[in-house]
Each structure stands twice: as structure tokens, then as C-alpha cells.
Regions:
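RNA-binding accessory domains that recognize and position tRNA/RNA substrates
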Residues: 450
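Short, positively charged and aromatic/hydrophobic N-terminal segments
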Residues: 13, 28-29, 38-45, 49-79
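Alpha-helix boundary/capping motif
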Residues: 21-24
Length: 450
């Protein structure tokens, strides 16, 4: 018989476990499978779906399917195994993507972006965090693991259309969308949603040769009338050491520093006294405002679900000094009926040699930042970088393929198991939504083992 685990909180899927005696399987494995949410048992003439609520309580669905009862119109005949396991989406084998069709998944479903030293975790609602090399010591953006509601803090884009404010990934405003789709691909994620005639598409990926994450926002006015929109970006900076960032408040609330030049926000906390690196968040167009103070952007007694600056339709041009620095751009967008406009946001990490830290007293050397940003100013440049990323993964996954009679085996072996293994190898399981990345870091044994 085939035993399929589908624990949505578990990072790994074990496709096949074989056992001769069902009751032995129950008695022996129930103790170690309590964390799994659901599994299906297949027998020669029936299958059994089991939902584990807690160790003492099981919900069991049994469907008999004997040869005598089967007909060509049988519901079971026309139903695939995946129909039970994919309530929230499906695999797209042609594009090697998993398509999530609702933002309201049981838990955040995340993808890993990055192949070399710069990594970003992104959920199906645009939550997540970003780091360079080490998720503890070089964390760019904050993430609160036990936050309520879950998965708040990420790389958010707010779209204000009159009195309606919404996000392409649904969170954090949770405004009901007219359509929603998230495609987690190999090294990238794409979000497509719409509200009141405006369609938004966001492509997020980490290019191969630069320490940055690209988010390409495409807005299309599908209505019959002109639209006046405002777009607000939002990331919250981590003060680099993610462990200390969550504890040492008496110091941390006094250290945040930023600079703003043109359309780029520079996060330079501790750059003056102890660091040779800073972070940037930029957009490839003239901005109509910005905020770098979280309190100024969100407002008193508010959260990311209802920022005061977005509600008012105007950023305050705040300059953070201590407290909680953020990066937010405001872009006012006029869209004629049928018109499309694209904006490219870049979140990046920059290092300077000790003798090249400053361009003048108290002003960071931005040369390397500007050189990197110059590579991602046009749609053609982004498309070229994205094509290079896809080509890299294509040649990597093509080194070993199988062609079996079972499409699920082909899908798992040719794409998702290999992708999972490479992500695990790159990060040594050091960072996820359940392994915070602030413990022992990249373990040597784990790296060798993976």
C-alpha cells in the first residue's frame, strides 16, 4: 500500500512507506506522526483519508471502491489522489510551479529565493524575511515568528484606489480581492491579483550575481475609466543581529540610522562604529514621498494592516533616528483605461572596504549601491536577469530526470525533490518559519549531511 503524508507545516514530503499490516502501521507510527495533519491509505479496493486532530482523536473517511462497484461514471474513477490533498492549489508541471489559488491557506506556504549568498523567504501572502549569508548576524528585514495574526511582516506593496486599500498578496490589509493567484516557482514567486478593475502582478526573485531581491510590480487598468492610484512599499529593517534585535531594546531603540537619496532608502544602523555594510531599498522611478520611521508610517496604536500614511494617501517624509526604522516609498500613479505601468523595487545588501566607507563626513559611500541598482532599472534588464535564473535552474534540474508511467513520480523526482535538496544544501536547514536561524547558524555537520 502507499502511504502519503501531507502535513502542511512540515517541510518535507515522504511519498512512499510500505507495510504489510495496517494495524502494525497504526500502532507503531501514530506516536511519531502526531505532527502530521493528514494522510491517505491506499488498499487494493479502497482508500482511507485520516485527519489527525490530536493523538487521541482521529477523523477517518473510508471510501470503498471494489471492482464490482466501479463504473465509468464512478466519482472515484474520475478523481485523482491530488484532489484530496490540493484543496488550496495545484501543480503546474509545464512551468514547474505550484499554483496557490487562495491566500487563506492553513499555514503560510513559503518559497526560498536565492542560490548563492543572498536569500529571501517569501510566503503566499508576501510575508517573510531576507538575509545575507547568515540569518542571525546579517538579517536585513524583521520577522516575528509567533506573531498574531500569523505571517505579518514581509515585503509589502499597498495599492490605494480611492478609499480602497489592498495588497497584491492579500496580507496585511486582508481586503477581499476579486481574484488571487500565487505561483511558487523554482527560485521565484509570482503574485497576480485584482481589485475594482485594477490588476497587479508582482514577480519576486534573487538574481544570480547580485546580493539583492527584485520585486517587479506591474499595474494594469482593466476598467473603462481612468484611475488615480497611490502605491506604497513597506519593509521593516532588522538591526542586523536578529537575536539581539528581539531582546536588547534598551539599546536597540537608540541605534537606528538611515539616509535617503532620490528614490533609494539606505539603512546604515551601526555602520559608523562597527559595520562595513548597509542595506538599501530602492525603486526605479521618482517618488512622491517616503517614510523611514515605523511610528510615522503606521501611526499610533496601528499595525501593518491599516497604516495611517496609506489611509491618508501621503507619506510624512520621516527620518528615523532610533526606534524602528523602515523603508517606504510613495508613488502616485495615473493609469488610463487599458494602460499598464511597471515599477522595479530592489532590496539589497552592500559592503564597503574599511578605507572606502564614507564619501564625506557622516555620509556613506553609495558607489557600489548605485552600480548594482543601475543593473535593474528597466524591464529588459529584469527580464534578462530572470531568464538567466531560469536557465540556471533548468540546466541544474536537467542533470537527472526520470520518465515513469506515474506523473506524480515524475513531478516529484524531476522537479520538487531536487529543488528541495538544493535549497536544503544552500541553507543547511538554518532558516525557515519554524527554524528561526538565530541559533547555531550553518552547522558543519548539517551542511555535509545535506
Amino acid at each position: 500500500m502507499c502511504f502519503w503524508f501531507a502535513g502542511s507545516a512540515f517541510r518535507y514530503i515522504f511519498p512512499f512507506v510500505f507495510c504489510d499490516h495496517v494495524f502494525e502501521l497504526f500502532l507503531y507510527t501514530l506516536r511519531i506522526l502526531r505532527a502530521f495533519s493528514r494522510f491517505i491509505l491506499h488498499f487494493p479496493h479502497c482508500f482511507c483519508i485520516i485527519q489527525i486532530r490530536n493523538p487521541e482523536y482521529l477523523i477517518v473517511y473510508l471510501a470503498l471502491s471494489t471492482p464490482q462497484r466501479k463504473t465509468k461514471h464512478s466519482t472515484y474513477n474520475n478523481m485523482k489522489e491530488g484532489d484530496f490533498l490540493m484543496k488550496y492549489g495545484h501543480f503546474d508541471d509545464v512551468h514547474q510551479e505550484y499554483v496557490i489559488t487562495t491566500p487563506k491557506t492553513p499555514l503560510p506556504w513559503i518559497n526560498y529565493l536565492g542560490c548563492n549568498e543572498f536569500f529571501s523567504l517569501i510566503s503566499n501572502t508576501c510575508g517573510g524575511y531576507t538575509f545575507y549569508k547568515d540569518a542571525k548576524l546579517l538579517r536585513l528585514t524583521r520577522y516575528r515568528y509567533n506573531n498574531v495574526p500569523a505571517d505579518i511582516n514581509g515585503k509589502y506593496l499597498y495599492i490605494k484606489d480611492g478609499d480602497t486599500v489592498w495588497n497584491p498578496g492579500w496580507q496585511p490589509t486582508k481586503t477581499e480581492l476579486d481574484s488571487y493567484e500565487c505561483r511558487h516557482g523554482i527560485g521565484y514567486s509570482r503574485f497576480t491579483s485584482s481589485k475594482n478593475g485594477v490588476k497587479a502582478s508582482v514577480l519576486s526573485f534573487v538574481p544570480l550575481n547580485d546580493n539583492c531581491e527584485i520585486s517587479q510590480l506591474t499595474l494594469t487598468n482593466g476598467s473603462s475609466e481612468d484611475k488615480k492610484l497611490s502605491v506604497f512599499s513597506y519593509v521593516e529593517w532588522c538591526l542586523w543581529n536578529a537575536d539581539d534585535d528581539m531582546k536588547n531594546f534598551q539599546r536597540n531603540l537608540s541605534t537606528g540610522e538611515v539616509e535617503v537619496q532620490d528614490s533609494t532608502i539606505y539603512h546604515k544602523t551601526e555602520y559608523r562604529e562597527r559595520r562595513n555594510h548597509y542595506a538599501i531599498y530602492s525603486v526605479n522611478t521618482k517618488i512622491d514621498g517616503f517614510d523611514t520611521s515605523r511610528d510615522a508610517f503606521l501611526g499610533a496604536y496601528r499595525g501593518a494592516d491599516s497604516p495611517e500614511a496609506v489611509e491618508n494617501g501621503k507619506c510624512t517624509n520621516s527620518m528615523a533616528s532610533g526606534w524602528s526604522p523602515i523603508a517606504s516609498h510613495q508613488i502616485n500613479v495615473d493609469l488610463a483605461a487599458g494602460e499598464t505601468k511597471t515599477f522595479i523595487f530592489v532590496l539589497g545588501y552592500i559592503e564597503n572596504p574599511e578605507d572606502e566607507k564614507w564619501e564625506s563626513y557622516g555620509v556613506i559611500n553609495k558607489t557600489r549601491a548605485k552600480e548594482m541598482l543601475a543593473k535593474y532599472q528597466t524591464d529588459a534588464q529584469v527580464e534578462e536577469a530572470f531568464a538567466a535564473l531560469q536557465a540556471y535552474w533548468k540546466q541544474l534540474l536537467a542533470r537527472y530526470t526520470v520518465a515513469s508511467a506515474d506523473e506524480k513520480v515524475n513531478r516529484m523526482v524531476n522537479t520538487w525533490n531536487q529543488y528541495q535538496c538544493m535549497v536544503t544544501f544552500n541553507m543547511s536547514r538554518s532558516a525557515s518559519y519554524y527554524e528561526s536561524g538565530i541559533g547555531r547558524g550553518m552547522g558543519f555537520r548539517d551542511s555535509c549531511q545535506d
